[in-house]
Amino acid sequence: MKFLDEAKVYIRSGDGGNGCVAFRREKFIEFGGPSGGNGGRGGDVIVEVADGLNTLIDYRYQQHFKAPKGANGMGSDRHGANGKAIVLKVPLGTQIIDEDRETLIHDFTRVGERLVLAEGGNGGFGNAHFKSSTNRAPRRANPGQPGEERWIWLRLKLIADAGLVGLPNAGKSTFLSKVSAAKPKIADYPFTTLHPQLGVVRVQDREFVLADIPGLIEGAHEGAGLGDRFLGHVERCRVLLHLVDAGCDHAGRAYKIVRGEMEAYAGALAEKVEIVALNKIDAVTAEDLKKQRDRLKRAAKKTPLLVSGVTGEGVQDVLRALVEVIGQAPVSDKAKGADASAAQAMETPVARAKPWSP
């Protein structure tokens, strides 16, 4: 399935049905009085988090969603049927953003969470509603209220416990395939990974989700390479695993390039807990390995772990370090806010527009 993490869609809730002007007509009843029913309410547009989805690809082929309008009122005091709501299914971690691409409307963080994004219009009153002691035969009815319409952006930010970062061809996909059942594309050239990949990692009796994002290059925050758009997928992670290729020219400079891009990104990535590992140690000599390790240690100001995604050497040490940090690291403030808003949305019933009167 092709991965798509952003889509623009148009939504419109249903118009309310019109009220009806009608009078009761029966044998031997000369003045039957008004009997026009009210119009039905238009259908809502609802967004719901569905389990098992991990892409927004469905919204590439359909961008317009319109809920049906409410049925018109009829004689004999028959009210029109309400329009059926339409439900947009989205993956866990989806954000609803206004058309300006800046205003966050909602952040979905729980499976099954629902949000009424556009409420259907209220139905109009039939003439039976307007009868009174002074107006026994009203000949007026209201039209239904129009529905709401808007353009919105759907933006997916994958939810994972740990995220893999590094330069292109640092061995991130090989590491992910080694520690999980994920099967990312692996090749000996930069930018093999074009879309984020997720894998479930099991360590003894613990398991966590590991995300692999496409590699960063210098100037990514300005759009170089694949840009930094995929950094949002590790923004929710509790810990970052920074892999550096032991066979690169200078491990310290390679580390600083990625750190610079993370600091330039408009988020809290640079403040997250980071585990640094020197990868592909099987491909260099012992002398070069020591030299690269010292360079990386000076740049990162911490002792890097040594690992090989091909032979498996050092993999368990890295996984144990990740599990230890995941168990201690708190959820980021942004994720906390998202959880709080989601909890409030689930506990508080969605407010409905009050019935209008002429």
From Swiss-Prot:
Report the cofactors.
Mg(2+)
Renumbered residue ranges of the record's region Disordered: 335-358
One Pfam annotation reads MMR_HSR1
Protein localization: Cytoplasm
The chain positions of domain Obg read: 1-159
Residues annotated as binding GTP are 166-173, 191-195, 212-215, 279-282, 308-310
| Domain named OBG-type G: residues | 160-327
- UniProt-listed InterPro entries: G_OBG, GTP-bd, GTP-bd_Obg/CgtA, GTP1-OBG_CS, GTP1_OBG_dom, GTP1_OBG_dom_sf, OBG_GTPase, P-loop_NTPase
- Which is an annotated GO molecular function term of this record? GTP binding
Taxonomic superkingdom:
Bacteria
- Enzyme class, top EC level, equals hydrolase
Per the UniProt record, which EC number(s) apply here?
A: 3.6.5.-
GO CC: one term? cytoplasm
Q: What does this protein do?
A: An essential GTPase which binds GTP, GDP and possibly (p)ppGpp with moderate affinity, with high nucleotide exchange rates and a fairly low GTP hydrolysis rate. Plays a role in control of the cell cycle, stress response, ribosome biogenesis and in those bacteria that undergo differentiation, in morphogenesis control.
Q: Which family does it belong to?
A: Belongs to the TRAFAC class OBG-HflX-like GTPase superfamily. OBG GTPase family.
Binding partners and assembly: Monomer.
Q: What is this protein called?
A: GTPase Obg
Species for this entry? Nitrobacter winogradskyi (strain ATCC 25391 / DSM 10237 / CIP 104748 / NCIMB 11846 / Nb-255)
